Design a protein with these regions (language model features):
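Anion-binding alpha/beta catalytic cores of soluble intermediary-metabolism enzymes, centered on
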Residues: 1-185, 189-190, 199-243
């Protein structure tokens, strides 16, 4: 299905969001969802205003008025809560499309701090992220990470637990366990599954916000609409709009 209309949320720094839409350079029409008086969209873009723009953005996505949505600078808690309710799911699973300093692109999951805390969660996330990689044309396998090398067993109970869980995820999915060696995983794979959501979030922030890499947004995996989550700390949302 062609994506003709893309909505993006604006709660702060409207100029940055507008500039991102201009830099995206896409044929799709971009529509801003913001509180009244926050910005002037001009002739190039549409604008929908309301006191709760996150509800409008998600509502229009599920009503078919827009074909895809980007969170932009809308608050995470309120926006994702409304999205969960509209999608009829009790949790969301996200995978971030990242690019390192060498220009290599890969998907990283889980990246939400409340995601990926059980073996069942990570098995589901790994399989869905692999499917997304295929849609995006990313070649390479799936790497399961843990909190140490197998030879580190016995050094700390949490390390032991992380190793055991990663081994189980690897066995259930058939994907290789790369232990803690994320550098090797990035060389060989297009999908990296972190030990938990906090680890994944830290990897994302280190690469995209401190290092030489960049983020392209984080599609939500377990809903039937296109919704790209973003970090409010991102310098631009052009990549997420293109995605």
């Amino acid at each position: 299905m062609p994506v003709r209309r893309i909505g993006i949320g604006v709660a702060a720094d409207g100029a940055r969001v507008q500039e991102s839409a201009r830099k995206a350079g896409i044929d799709s029409r971009v529509i801003f969802y913001a509180k009244p008086g926050l910005l002037d969209a001009g002739q190039d873009f549409g604008i929908e205003e309301g006191d709760e723009p996150w509800k409008m953005l998600v509502g229009d996505l599920y009503a078919g008025k827009i074909d895809a949505a980007v969170r932009g600078t809308l608050p995470s808690g309120a926006t994702l809560r409304v999205l969960r309710e509209a999608a009829g799911v009790d949790h969301l699973e996200r995978a971030a499309l990242l690019e390192d300093g060498k220009g290599r692109r890969f998907l990283l999951a889980p990246v939400g701090i409340d995601e990926g805390w059980t073996v069942v969660d990570r098995v589901a996330i790994a399989r869905r992220t692999k499917d997304l990689a295929g849609i995006l044309g990313l070649e390479g396998g799936v790497a399961i990470l843990s909190g140490g090398r197998l030879s580190d067993a016995g050094r700390h109970p949490r390390v032991d637990e992380s190793l055991a869980q990663a081994e189980l995820v690897a066995r259930l999915t058939g994907f290789p366990h790369f232990e803690i060696l994320i550098e090797d995983a990035a060389e060989e794979c297009s999908v990296i599954i972190a030990p938990d959501g906090i680890s994944g979030n830290l990897v994302f922030r280190t690469l995209a916000l401190l290092g030489c890499g960049q983020g392209h947004g984080a599609p939500v995996l377990n809903i039937d609409r296109i919704f790209i989550d973003t970090s409010r700390a991102s310098p631009s949302y052009a990549n997420a709009i293109r995605l």
